[in-house]
Amino acid sequence: MNIINEHISFGDRRLVGQEKAKHQIERILLSDRLAHSYLITGPDGSGKTAFSLALAEVVNGVNHLTDLKDLTISKKSSWFTHPDIHVFIPLPSTVGSDELQSRLELLAKDPYEIVDFTLRPALNDAESSKNRRAFYPIDYYHNEIRPKSVYKPNEGRRTVIVLTNVDTMRKETANAFLKLLEEPSGNILFILTASQPDQLLPTIISRCQQIRLHPLSKDEVAEGLINHDGVDKNDAELLARLSGGNYSTCRFLDIETLQQIRNESVEFLRFSYTQDVPELLNLINNWNKNLNKENQIALCNTLEQLLRDITVYRETENESLITNIDQLDVIKKFCTSMTEARLEEMIDNIQQLKGLLYQNVQFKYIGTALSLRFTRLMRGLDPAIDSESSWKHLPALIN
């Protein structure tokens, strides 16, 4: 029996966007020539985990994320209950078995749930900022992952092992895993995901067939929110504009909070330009105290989009190209005031410092450093501290 036919659309019940990657997977499945390992890469929130779970289900005939019609071969309701599908996520240094199980249960309910310990340290506390860097320790590999690789399929076509965020593997674990990739059994299928494939051993990449996902467009994010999350069209469009292509994260955002963030991001630029230190410190400290990580990332995306709108309008004066059209008056005023502003460098600084949020650097340090840099870049001046001496800025911001 074929895995799929031309009447089946991969991931049609849940996957958001990524039509090119979907068609690539459909061609693979139609050819009936599965590789032993696939590496799904793409930015955070683009759907890597959802794609890996959907692929695992289709290979073993589970009619869930994809409507398999008459090609269903499993009676199981999803990958979560299938005996031949094993899913692993990176773990922090201390974690209970119940805690891991609860995250997999969440993922079973929705493949776009954020279950990464680094991004979401606690499931029951949205405000938690506890540092829980997660990775694949060597004993996790030897005790949990490798034993599953010798299992023969019980009822499916393959024993499928899904490893999310393999770019967090320590060198010792990566070398051990490489040996497994080099000598796979005929019945095993590895599906790996990575946001930063450049952090992987080149030999691991060479052993996998790659499937690349791109940042989701604003329309794709909005469509996902409307169709799968029941979000109002206007709210979905606002969330999508501020998502940075990250569908997973924007599902956690509150509309009222986002509206406040939009207004305060304008104040941040204004205070940075006027060098109003008391107001800046008050604003930054409030963000550090009251915004969780998802909202802090949304704040960075808001600032970035606002600066892109200022850039576009300064170059074209074409209102139809502005994303935040309701803030057109603000954009025009900034263009008039900041005629020498080095906007691209300001955007680069946001992207650079946003990465530190994922490393659990406190926002009060990030916001302070950003405002100090903006003060000079807005005037067309070099930052007071050059990029080669970033350690002088704040100890927390060492590159």
Where does each model-flagged region fall?
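Charged, glycine-rich active-site and insertion segments that engage polyanionic ligands
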Residues: M1-W79, G186-L189, S195-T302, L306-N399
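Clamp-loader machinery-focused feature within the broader ASCE/P-loop NTPase space
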Residues: N2-E172
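Conserved adenine-binding aromatic site and its adjacent loop/helix in ATP-hydrolyzing domains
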Residues: P147, K179, P202, S206
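Conserved catalytic/switch belt of AAA+ P-loop NTPases
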Residues: V150, N175-L189
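Structural recognition of the conserved hydrophobic beta-strand(s) that form the central parallel beta-sheet
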Residues: V160-T164, F177, I188-A194
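Residues immediately C-terminal
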Residues: T168, E183, Q199
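Conserved strand-to-helix beginnings and helix N-cap segments that scaffold or border functional pockets
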Residues: K171-N175, I297
